[in-house]
């Protein structure tokens, strides 16, 4: 019989909060509001805690657990994965972080030309005992146009791509597409992969008529999220890749601050 080195006793008396596998690329299926499901490729991190008297964890068991559940990734399945990790690895805590690209088919505003746009999403969950802490993050590319630049210039205004990330905790199922719509409706204009000339004209003029600082976008997203009853807690981050500055502009808030108003 082969020696099990991981199961050797360790006498250094040091508890490890997280041990496991990182940056595992893996095919998964996620829920899609329009098409029911969507196939994508995720990057996963999976961890458990390690008692002070255990020398190592069993890395292969993380993959074995994932193999049982990879066909569909949703909050219910993630809870089952975490419970299985704790059981097979004899742990009190388990953590999973899943980041993946999510694609939507978008129509250009004038010509209706269709193209796919990529969004970045992630699930982060930790089970400590029987308590589950679960959050979802949705990041969307957006377009911002500077209100100050528009106000002080005789013509034109500096504008650029930006990104907005919403991290939230919810008591019910929330579609990724719902969060994307909230973000895009709060920007100067949305981003498109394919635009013909008539579309470019529309998007350019729409952004000019709807100037936004990153602060404006963050606040407008927060106001829309506040009306979304399914969401219990949220964090909004907006970063603009400034076209005329050597730095990015950034704004951040959480629902904790909003509740104090």
Curated annotation (Swiss-Prot):
Taxonomic path: Bacteria, Thermotogati, Thermotogota, Thermotogae, Thermotogales
Query: What protein does this entry describe?
Result: GTP cyclohydrolase FolE2
- List residue numbers at the site (May be catalytically important): 146
Q: Which UniProt keywords apply?
A: Hydrolase
- The catalytic activity of this protein is classed by the Enzyme Commission as 3.5.4.16
Pathway the protein contributes to? Cofactor biosynthesis; 7,8-dihydroneopterin triphosphate biosynthesis; 7,8-dihydroneopterin triphosphate from GTP: step 1/1
Q: Function of this protein?
A: Converts GTP to 7,8-dihydroneopterin triphosphate.
What NCBIfam families does the record point to? PRK13674.1-1 (NF010200)
Which InterPro entries does the protein's record reference?
A: GTP_cyclohydrolase_FolE2, GTP_cyclohydrolase_FolE2/MptA
Q: Which organism is it from?
A: Fervidobacterium nodosum (strain ATCC 35602 / DSM 5306 / Rt17-B1)
Q: Which reaction does it catalyse?
A: GTP + H2O = 7,8-dihydroneopterin 3'-triphosphate + formate + H(+)
Q: Which Gene3D superfamilies match?
A: Urate Oxidase
Q: Does the keyword Repeat apply?
A: no
**GO molecular function annotations of the record:** GTP cyclohydrolase I activity
Q: What class of enzyme is it?
A: hydrolase
Looking at the keywords, is Aminoacyl-tRNA synthetase present?
no
């Amino acid at each position: 019989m082969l020696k099990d080195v991981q199961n050797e006793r360790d006498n250094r008396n040091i508890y490890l909060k997280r041990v496991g596998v990182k940056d595992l690329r893996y095919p998964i299926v996620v829920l899609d509001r329009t098409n029911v499901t969507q196939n994508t490729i995720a990057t996963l991190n999976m961890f458990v805690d390690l008692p002070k008297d255990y020398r190592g964890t069993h890395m292969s068991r993380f993959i074995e657990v994932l193999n049982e559940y990879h066909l569909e990734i949703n909050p219910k399945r993630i809870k089952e994965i975490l419970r299985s990790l704790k059981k097979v690895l004899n742990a009190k805590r388990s953590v999973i972080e899943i980041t993946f690209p999510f694609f939507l088919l978008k129509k250009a505003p004038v010509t209706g030309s269709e193209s796919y746009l990529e969004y970045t999403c992630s699930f982060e969950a930790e089970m400590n005992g029987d308590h589950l802490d679960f959050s979802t993050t949705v990041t969307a590319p957006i377009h911002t146009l500077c209100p100050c630049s528009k106000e002080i210039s005789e013509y034109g205004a500096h504008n650029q791509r930006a990104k907005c990330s919403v991290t939230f905790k919810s008591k019910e199922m929330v579609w990724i597409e719902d969060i994307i719509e909230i973000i895009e409706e709060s920007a100067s204009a949305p981003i498109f992969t394919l635009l013909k000339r008539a579309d470019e004209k529309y998007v350019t003029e729409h952004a000019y008529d709807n100037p936004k600082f990153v602060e404006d976008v963050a606040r407008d997203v927060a106001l829309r999220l506040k009306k979304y009853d399914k969401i219990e807690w949220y964090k909004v981050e907006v970063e603009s890749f400034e076209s005329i500055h050597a730095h990015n502009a950034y704004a951040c808030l959480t629902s904790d601050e909003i509740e104090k108003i």
